[in-house]
């Protein structure tokens, strides 16, 4: 592997990168990307560069992204009033439709930018390669849930094919409907249930 052609010139030295690769080559990195990173062009470009390098040096990773500010913008544009209960957004049938739209737009943007750098990625969402089965959180919150099961085999198959799954914090309930999850909760559940060895 010609690391000097992969690592940015202002990045760490090659000896340090080789140590990092040797240490973590048998593990899976679970990366949380918050909505603030996605809205800041400089941070977003750095995030894309980092994920691309991780893929090209042969490390395995999963990216879970949020999008709270993008969701708020989408709801405001459509005059949807937001209510919160204990810090969680109440999501009725109309609200969840716009939440899904905002998150899928973000997911598509991340995929597009990574593919433009020849990074091997795939989308994980209720519409494409769904792996998350949901339990509703409460009737009060509407379409808000937590993971019931996560399809470990499906995720590992993507990773074995040298792909980085880009995961939307959405899943399907037993009723076939889409639910939103807390991003951090999803990250923790991926670590506990899906991966043999993870770090972040």
Description of each model-found segment:
Residues 1-200:
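Nucleotide/pyrophosphate-binding catalytic subdomain
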């Amino acid at each position: 592997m010609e690391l000097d052609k992969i690592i940015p010139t202002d990045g760490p030295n090659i000896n340090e990168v080789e140590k990092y690769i040797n240490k973590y080559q048998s593990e899976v990195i679970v990366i949380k990307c918050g909505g603030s990173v996605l809205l800041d062009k400089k941070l977003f470009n750095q995030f894309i560069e980092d994920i691309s390098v991780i893929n090209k040096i042969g490390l395995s990773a999963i990216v879970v992204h949020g999008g709270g500010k993008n969701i708020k913008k989408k709801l405001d544009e459509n005059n949807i009033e937001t209510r919160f209960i204990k810090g969680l957004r109440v999501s009725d049938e109309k609200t969840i439709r716009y939440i899904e739209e905002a998150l899928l737009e973000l997911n598509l943007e991340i995929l597009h930018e990574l593919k433009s750098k020849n990074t091997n990625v795939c989308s994980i969402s209720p519409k494409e390669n769904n792996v998350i089965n949901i339990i509703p959180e409460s009737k009060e919150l509407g379409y808000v849930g937590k993971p019931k099961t996560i399809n470990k085999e499906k995720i590992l198959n993507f990773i074995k094919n040298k792909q980085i799954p880009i995961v939307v914090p959405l899943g399907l309930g037993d009723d076939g409907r889409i639910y939103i999850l807390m991003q951090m909760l999803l990250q923790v559940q991926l670590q506990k249930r899906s991966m043999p060895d993870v770090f972040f």
